[in-house]
Amino acid sequence: MKPFSSLSFGFAVAILIAAQPACSSKSSGGGGSGGKYGTGGIPSSGGSSGNGGTTAAGGTIGSGGAAGNSGGTTGSMDAAAGGATGTGGTIASGGTIASGGTTGGSGGTTGGPDAGMGGVPGKGGSAAGGAGGSGQDAPQGSGGNTSGTGGAGPGSGGAPLTGGSTGSGGNGLGGNTGTGGAAGGTTGNTDGGTSGVVACPDLPGAERSTLYSITANGAPLFVEKLSKFSPEMQVHYAYASLSGTGAATIAVTVSETFSTYKLSPKSRQISATKSGNTITFSSGPNYLILQVDSKELLFILLDAEETNPPHVGDANVKSLADYTVDNTGATLVTSKIQSAINAASGATQNILYVPPGKYTVGELWLKSNMTMYLACGAILYGSSNTGDFNTGSGGINIEGMQHSLIRMYQIKNTNLLGRGVLDSNGVAIRAAGLNASLLKIEQSSSITVDGIVVRDSSYWNTLSYRSDQVTIQNYKVINCRPTTTTYNNTDGVDFVESTNGTLYNAFLYTGDDGMAPKNEDSNGTINCKNLMHQHIVVYNNSVGCKIGTNSMGQSMDSITFKDVDVVKAGRAMTIEAYDTAVVSNTTFEDIRVEAADSMLINLALDVPPTWRTAADTGVYKDTYFTNVSSDVKQVVSLHGKSSTVNITGVHFSNFTVQGKAITSQTDTDASWDINAYV
């Protein structure tokens, strides 16, 4: 093989970096087991009934729950508050002095069913907390509605323990059942530690997995099986948020016997142990994939706790519940939710809060100057009737993809936030002949999408078209993936003719490309520029990190893929631009490949387009591969088309295959396929 002048290897840089692992931890990486932090209480859905709270070592004085009135009222799910119990409650016992710390007050048990008679106050959540001191008595319940609160503050010497869950209110005759608060104590501040776990309410109608069960810090998480993907790959997933800065202990129990397992991404360097049919490990916020033998995959999706989420009752928040919308999924509620969206745009109450529940909808159009917030446990579920997706006009039709579950068309300053779920029911509407994305952002600016799970798109899941300053983060994509190595057009996130876009901290499980910026318009009036894809986990059948295939227009410039774990893909990194655009200043940096079915790297210009009419005249200039490592030896294919339609300036720095440094294109530790036009 002759040397190619346009191919460069950074020898000095490679030697310098080789002493440091290419998959070293980064600021955005998930937490390891680390030291031990004092933890807050594990949130319980609605609070546990009966037993009083346990005194936390190093905790502050927890206040006892106040007695509720006859027929206790429902406790707030938004606050760390237990529901009110029945009258006649006894005084909660005072806390005892914690070892090296302060005392935590123990709570009482809940009221009985008979009009609250003889009820004992619900306890306050225990917590790791401040300086030690003597315990004090909790106030006597006297029919009041005061809720028990968890202690707060840093621990000071005592060994941190998990704070207790809150107590439930009594069920008085003729009254509503009181419900315990959802929050536990706050995380302590001693060295080392574990995170508190905030679990979502179960999604209405979700199918519980019979293969996997999970606990986080001992609390069960709901594991959903997406069997609707059958006969294609069926998957299971669990989701939670972690409070604090430490790690949670995750235990996964498999109902069937198994011998091997793999936890990915491997770059997280999480040590797991197997005991019987249970796998245990510690992790901070991370998006993880567990492969057990050849069984169906399990996704464990752990986010950091939300910062300042909206609450019902805030001056700028309007709840969807105020519109008497069916939250069981039994009826179509598109028009009611659209009315609520329209009312929020530019209003004082410009945050539309979607509470837990299932809402069956067709196409919805978000508006400027508003926020839609999906609470944990809320799901907007697409109708199976394709006609319900034709609710408006405007926007581009790409490959028959005119409609979407959520539309943002010619708007600005709009947010889509929360820990809820969007599911476009793609399997059903694809079978009915409709190509529809799940989220379509068109000709819009200053858009933020944060935290949600987006599932089952019939076509490209998330599309940003001719938009500027779109930020998508903490994003979980779960699409249908074929059982074979074929693909079904269910891309993850595609920036199309967009500028200054960011995809950060995302999980992309797709049946086609994970990320694939494109140019669609042959006129070339707007082109892709300044696009960042960073801290991503990818598992798919096609390409992990890709530019193309559509590459119309004049240019595609400054596109970066950084800190990406390709757990599995057909091809890991690809530029496949067969049209007219000059693709320049492309960066693949800190890319870690665990599996690639056919190619590790594929830069191609010599494959004729089969379904487009644009001239194949594009070129690739200055493509950088920096800190790229692969566990598999697959083909590195670099193919130009001619002396003018060619590839120039391909730069490798710290490129390793199966642990071996690649220092030239003649190095046999990599599998090279380079033609004369590179």
Question: Where would I find each of the regions flagged by the language model?
Answer:
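Ser/Thr-rich, Pro/Gly/Ala-heavy low-complexity intrinsically disordered linkers and tails
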Residues: 19-195
